[in-house]
């Protein structure tokens, strides 16, 4: 019985990985070991930064909503108080939607916010 080597499969794996390393500087694009290390690192950063991007977007939305509350309603209420008022009045709107309403159509944001704040007892 002849000995079977994985030469063809190994070459195929290496070729696939090296094709993803194109455009990198130095040995990272030419040498397999250093390129493979760089590829693993790049994948790790890609995963980490996808999570980080979501967190940054959430903070941006909260900042926009908070700014809209201060500017259009002329109150110094914080975002978390506003959200608790939304929950008390059973108005379910997510952060992204509130932020987009504030940016694109600020008058409708103030019209949306005023009845909620009045129903909870805050004088505007």
UniProtKB/Swiss-Prot annotation:
One record GO biological process: translation
Family, per entry: Belongs to the bacterial ribosomal protein bL20 family.
Main location: plastid
Cellular component annotations (GO), alphabetically ordered: chloroplast; ribonucleoprotein complex; ribosome
Entry GO MF terms: rRNA binding; structural constituent of ribosome
Record's keyword annotation contains DNA damage: no
Function recorded in the entry: Binds directly to 23S ribosomal RNA and is necessary for the in vitro assembly process of the 50S ribosomal subunit. It is not involved in the protein synthesizing functions of that subunit.
Short name of one Pfam family: Ribosomal_L20
Localization annotation: Plastid, Chloroplast
Keywords assigned by UniProt, alphabetized: Chloroplast, Plastid, Ribonucleoprotein, Ribosomal protein, RNA-binding, rRNA-binding
Name the record gives this protein: Large ribosomal subunit protein bL20c
Record flagged with keyword Chloroplast: yes
Source organism of the structure: Euglena gracilis
InterPro entries: Ribosomal_bL20, RIBOSOMAL_L20_CS, Ribosomal_protein_bL20_C
Family matches, as Gene3D superfamilies: 6.10.160.10, Ribosomal protein L20
């Amino acid at each position: 019985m002849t000995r079977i080597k994985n030469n063809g499969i190994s070459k195929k794996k290496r070729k696939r990985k090296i094709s993803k390393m194109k455009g990198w500087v130095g040995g990272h694009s030419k040498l397999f070991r250093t390129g493979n290390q760089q590829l693993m690192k790049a994948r790790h950063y890609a995963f980490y930064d996808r999570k980080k991007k979501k967190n940054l977007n959430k903070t941006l939305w909260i900042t926009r909503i908070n700014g809209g509350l201060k500017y259009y309603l002329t109150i110094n209420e914080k975002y978390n108080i506003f959200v608790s008022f939304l929950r008390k009045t059973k108005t379910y709107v997510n952060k992204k939607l509130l932020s987009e309403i504030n940016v694109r159509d600020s008058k409708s944001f103030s019209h949306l916010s005023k009845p909620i704040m009045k129903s909870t007892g805050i004088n505007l």
